[in-house]
Design a protein with these regions (language model features):
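N-terminal carbohydrate-binding accessory modules
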Residues: 1-38
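The substrate-binding groove and active-site-proximal loops of carbohydrate-active enzymes
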Residues: 10-18, 45-59, 106-123, 150
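A cross-family glycoside hydrolase active-site/sugar-binding cleft signature
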Residues: 11-15, 40-42, 76-80, 145-147
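An active-site-proximal structural segment forming one wall of the substrate-binding cleft
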Residues: 64-71, 111-144, 170-178
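Short, well-ordered coil/turn segments that N-cap beta-strands
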Residues: 6-8, 35-37, 71-75, 137-142
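Conserved small/polar residues in nucleotide/adenosyl-binding loops
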Residues: 186-193
Length: 193
């Protein structure tokens, strides 16, 4: 990875795997015409890269990286952990997030992982390591993009437990939580149970 940027990056997300490969060359021409010099790739490609638990296939991502590198387009490499693959949710349902209404989400959309699931953490770490091993020395990769934008909060027991641990570590006592969060404003402090 480069120690610093050569110039101001100008670009956005690029998902060429959603289009026929014949379009990629035209994309590069349009990038140059528009002055685009960087692009974020691989944001939601986990299912494509890891089609099953112990199988990884970087063929298409290699082609995308090679195309962008050949055209000297700077790459922001995402870890692909913004959306779970179906096999993972089927085999390990606890990796999917639970929303504020208690609904357990499935695969097929973004922000669908429980960040405190040990299974999610294990596979996300393994994928990030494999990406770093494979692409870490590529001079056109200028930074790494982890997960995606904020969203997809999880309210499962793993997350509730982790939140309580965080509160205790940060504030030490419930009185300090109430003070810091101004919980006495609406007549009563947070309950102690």
């Amino acid at each position: 990875m480069q120690p610093k940027f050569k110039k101001m990056l100008y670009g956005g997300d690029y998902n060429p795997n959603q289009w026929p490969k014949e379009i990629w060359d035209e994309d590069m021409k349009l990038f140059h015409q528009a002055g685009i010099n960087s692009t974020t790739i691989n944001v939601f490609s986990w299912a494509k890269i890891q089609p099953s638990e112990n199988e990884y296939d970087f063929t298409e991502l290699d082609e995308i990286v090679d195309t962008l590198t050949k055209e000297d387009v700077q790459i922001v490499m995402a870890t692909s952990t913004g959306a779970l693959p179906a096999w993972m949710v089927h085999r390990y349902p606890e990796v999917a997030r639970t929303d504020f209404e208690g609904r357990h989400h499935k695969f097929g959309h973004r922000h669908n992982a429980c960040p405190n699931s040990p299974v999610f953490q294990k596979y996300a770490k393994r994928l990030a390591e494999k990406l770093a091993e494979r692409y870490g020395d590529n001079k056109n990769i200028v930074c790494w993009h982890i997960s995606n934008e904020y969203g997809g909060e999880c309210y499962c027991e793993n997350c509730a437990k982790a939140f309580r641990v965080w509160l205790k570590d940060k504030y030490k006592t419930l009185d300090e939580v109430n003070k810091a969060w101004n919980c006495l404003l609406y007549t009563s402090p947070s309950p102690r149970d």
